[in-house]
Amino acid sequence: MSYNYVVTAQKPTAVNGCVTGHFTSAEDLNLLIAKNTRLEIYVVTAEGLRPVKEVGMYGKIAVMELFRPKGESKDLLFILTAKYNACILEYKQSGESIDIITRAHGNVQDRIGRPSETGIIGIIDPECRMIGLRLYDGLFKVIPLDRDNKELKAFNIRLEELHVIDVKFLYGCQAPTICFVYQDPQGRHVKTYEVSLREKEFNKGPWKQENVEAEASMVIAVPEPFGGAIIIGQESITYHNGDKYLAIAPPIIKQSTIVCHNRVDPNGSRYLLGDMEGRLFMLLLEKEEQMDGTVTLKDLRVELLGETSIAECLTYLDNGVVFVGSRLGDSQLVKLNVDSNEQGSYVVAMETFTNLGPIVDMCVVDLERQGQGQLVTCSGAFKEGSLRIIRNGIGIHEHASIDLPGIKGLWPLRSDPNRETDDTLVLSFVGQTRVLMLNGEEVEETELMGFVDDQQTFFCGNVAHQQLIQITSASVRLVSQEPKALVSEWKEPQGKNISVASCNSSQVVVAVGRALYYLQIHPQELRQISHTEMEHEVACLDITPLGDSNGMSPLCAIGLWTDISARIAKLPSFELLHKEMLGGEIIPRSILMTTFESSHYLLCALGDGALFYFGLNIETGLLSDRKKVTLGTQPTVLRTFRSLSTTNVFACSDRPTVIYSSNHKLVFSNVNLKEVNYMCPLNSDGYPDSLALANNSTLTIGTIDEIQKLHIRTVPLYESPRKICYQEVSQCFGVLSSRIEVQDTSGGTTALRPSASTQALSSSVSSSKLFSSSTAPHETSFGEEVEVHNLLIIDQHTFEVLHAHQFLQNEYALSLVSCKLGKDPNTYFIVGTAMVYPEEAEPKQGRIVVFQYSDGKLQTVAEKEVKGAVYSMVEFNGKLLASINSTVRLYEWTTEKELRTECNHYNNIMALYLKTKGDFILVGDLMRSVLLLAYKPMEGNFEEIARDFNPNWMSAVEILDDDNFLGAENAFNLFVCQKDSAATTDEERQHLQEVGLFHLGEFVNVFCHGSLVMQNLGETSTPTQGSVLFGTVNGMIGLVTSLSESWYNLLLDMQNRLNKVIKSVGKIEHSFWRSFHTERKTEPATGFIDGDLIESFLDISRPKMQEVVANLQYDDGSGMKREATADDLIKVVEELTRIH
């Protein structure tokens, strides 16, 4: 068996739907947003959108509508999922707790029926008498809205019109009436029917209109006084109500297709329309009052307001503010202005909501060589196309920065005895010291009486008896706070320079070469208590008081040169309590005693970025549990700071890290800064609970995030990215992208807008010897859209487009790899293409082009003609493996720099995906699931090892390990196949067994090995192996990792218990939601643990936790089973949350 854990690292971000109404209360205006399986509820306030609650549905939200039945004080929410679970939800708030109550629920799936091509449509009668659903061709399903019905019961009415494009309920009709656009062999027509609840059938409707525009696609029901319906087409907009017919064909709407609409005014006089190019229009209905006082429609008018993100849905909120929900780009809150700006636009973006979808491709890279992966995704499409750089870490929010190079240390001070907060920052430089006064948010340089400024400071701070201390290379200086004056000074008896110092509020230890001196701080006096000689020179010191020692430390931690040791000595006698040899050549640079979660530790950082940490017994001074991690590559400086009343340690280096403890394990979290040399906590009036951070050139003051989270940076391309790969030698990314151009009158094409490929620093164009341009069987006509494909070379630091290489006309770039081939020392970008013509069912020719990028130039090294589309390529043992239409082919790279075919494998329908491990090749097919090949180097050919005989339409594949293979298919499921090497017969061995099945509810475009968290840092007892990330169409990033059998069984038990305790919204069974489901079959999930459900354990109340753990058997690592406590499970789950 194969045991896996699937969890969300980034929830879906693409918006599939949005509605507005009064859901949380009659007074609140709410915006409800559907992001695939997640429902987000906001209140619209004067300040913007305020999040109220986020609900995870056990299903993909297909329909979401607010309605208010008679007798209700606020709106109810109707939701239908893709697996046909329907529910009516109500918002209930009591005190702090918010509940979403399921008023009624049921499944409305038919056992037979062909799901409609135009998807699921759900509509609600304006009088709230019924809900109408168009799920299958030829059927209209009705759910009567009875007040007290807990179960949603539905019945079907036969529809003669099989191919319905869109349907709506009309306003102001005695009986519920539907109006719909349908297609038949003659064209498209509009028809209406009355729905009779009693007879459960249709009656003849009030009007119909035959032969409307051939592209008519949307019905908008218009409220009274007008009534009737508006039909939106590709070129025309028409209004019908039986006795009135109005048509307009504004040229402005022809360029693109209108895809969404929303009513602005309750009386239906204005509508917003959004098209596929991201343009926003206003449709105005002009009225005319008749003699008898009735109102009729006089005219329709369309105005272009401006440009937004490409809208999937629109909803008008209030005061000219519109929410634009987007699937292809970031969603927006926009303001509609009365007057246009210089560009002629009436639209201004107020706020942007990040969307990673659709993630078409991605790669994991460690750009800063920080041992932590960053994910770079190809996100968005058309003008919304972008690269997104995603990394996990603790964010620092910068509030001020000052250019100050060469800082060697910094300390906060309270210069005034009556202050609670810091008002001064002391900065140390080589040979000098500077003092900054903090006045509110203002920072100015000043001088402190009693301080010296012509020496480097080693320590500075507030100490006992309302005094300040400054330790410089020459002396230890004690200064009274009021008035500021030097009251005591200690110098080394021979006047030698101090090399290292440590100080707390009442004690000082300084090192002069090998000698150590211990001083105590008294009123107006520094008193030398003792001194000693060490065997070697002292490299670092610490006397941080631990435990309840009243601010006095009985211990001194010392790091020495030469023998590379860490020692614990007793104060005041300097008696050696423990000596720890650290080994190696690199000296300790920073040593620190600290307490995390009431356990004491000694941390010791070396000059190469390594960190040792030990348990410390403060009674005996003994060290235990030695562990080592690597935090960077440069000397590391350790400083403590407090955040959320817990102690944290900040490790300053080229890879700044925050160290804290969780469940008595140390956790190391990346900080999202390039490098930090020194830091100190700062709590001033203008900068409360902040940190001051110094690097080589700058001093920064900022606040720190409480938790790790994903940080996303956007690099807009304004065109569609398709594939990405990273090339370390040239420090570049290769990106395949495509832009849309339009055929102009001269026969050439022009770009619609400036984008990455048209604005690169340099560019080149393919000229192929292989294809003469006249072979194109297809002539484009004026106004036709053409895709132009490019290879972009993008700098890994600045993300600037350094070069754009344009491919041939009609040539689509499909695959990309960066690799070395054979014995050739060069690294190449290799692109696989296809010549795409509309009249060909599948491409008949393509190319493999080998590029080299060096010294800012892109050169074509070789090209190879192939008879088909190069869907996928990977480097394979120094050769190039490619899938071309149905063939898997291996090329070797000759000394003449040409690709030569070595062997082929033909047994596929369409080989779309390739992954390799050792000599094994996993092939993902369009419809024939996955196949495992082995390359036989001696014979120089492929051998078919095994295949999955289930017909899965693949969207991505990955190799988990030698025997387990992960697949994603087009019905939103994941599965794992296993190679059965131990099988007795050949026939069994040739079957890949499906051992894992799981319904993800997301369309996976890409899998890749890698992780978003620091690897192998600190102790981890997470029983997981490997980490495969995946990116989906909705912008979700997920992770699949493998479990041992015992852990799988524990988590499975926990999952089943959680399902009894956690009530799902809409009363949908978790087992139903996660069951593997295609048009062919439905099977229960197996071999996968739902990590999102397991992690929800941390969010439930303590009594509910107790309910989950009751009688749960747990092995705590001792080999013995015992009953688990809630805290045991909290530990387990917190460990699991750390993998993403």
Curated annotation (Swiss-Prot):
Q: Could you state one GO biological process linked to this protein?
A: ubiquitin-dependent protein catabolic process
Q: Where is this region: Interaction with CDT1 and CUL4A?
A: 771-1140
Q: Where is this region: WD repeat beta-propeller A?
A: 13-356
- Kindly indicate whether the keyword Ubl conjugation belongs to this entry: yes
- Gene name tied to this protein: DDB1
- Cystine pairs annotated here are none
Q: Which UniProt keywords apply?
A: Acetylation, Biological rhythms, Cytoplasm, DNA damage, DNA repair, DNA-binding, Isopeptide bond, Nucleus, Phosphoprotein, Repeat, Ubl conjugation, Ubl conjugation pathway
What is the official name of this protein in its record? DNA damage-binding protein 1
Q: What does this protein do?
A: Protein, which is both involved in DNA repair and protein ubiquitination, as part of the UV-DDB complex and DCX (DDB1-CUL4-X-box) complexes, respectively. Core component of the UV-DDB complex (UV-damaged DNA-binding protein complex), a complex that recognizes UV-induced DNA damage and recruit proteins of the nucleotide excision repair pathway (the NER pathway) to initiate DNA repair. The UV-DDB complex preferentially binds to cyclobutane pyrimidine dimers (CPD), 6-4 photoproducts (6-4 PP), apurinic sites and short mismatches.
What is its pathway? Answer: Protein modification; protein ubiquitination
Please tell me where this protein is predominantly located. cytoplasm
Q: Which InterPro entries match?
A: Beta-prop_RSE1/DDB1/CPSF1_1st, Cleavage/polyA-sp_fac_asu_C, Quinoprotein_ADH-like_sf, RSE1/DDB1/CFT1/CPSF1, WD40/YVTN_repeat-like_dom_sf
- Please describe the quaternary structure of this protein: Component of the UV-DDB complex which includes DDB1 and DDB2; the heterodimer dimerizes to give rise to a heterotetramer when bound to damaged DNA. The UV-DDB complex interacts with monoubiquitinated histone H2A and binds to XPC via the DDB2 subunit. Component of numerous DCX (DDB1-CUL4-X-box) E3 ubiquitin-protein ligase complexes which consist of a core of DDB1, CUL4A or CUL4B and RBX1. DDB1 may recruit specific substrate targeting subunits to the DCX complex.
Molecular-function GO term, any one: DNA binding
Q: Which SUPFAM superfamilies match?
A: Quinoprotein alcohol dehydrogenase-like
Residue numbers carrying Phosphothreonine: 1125
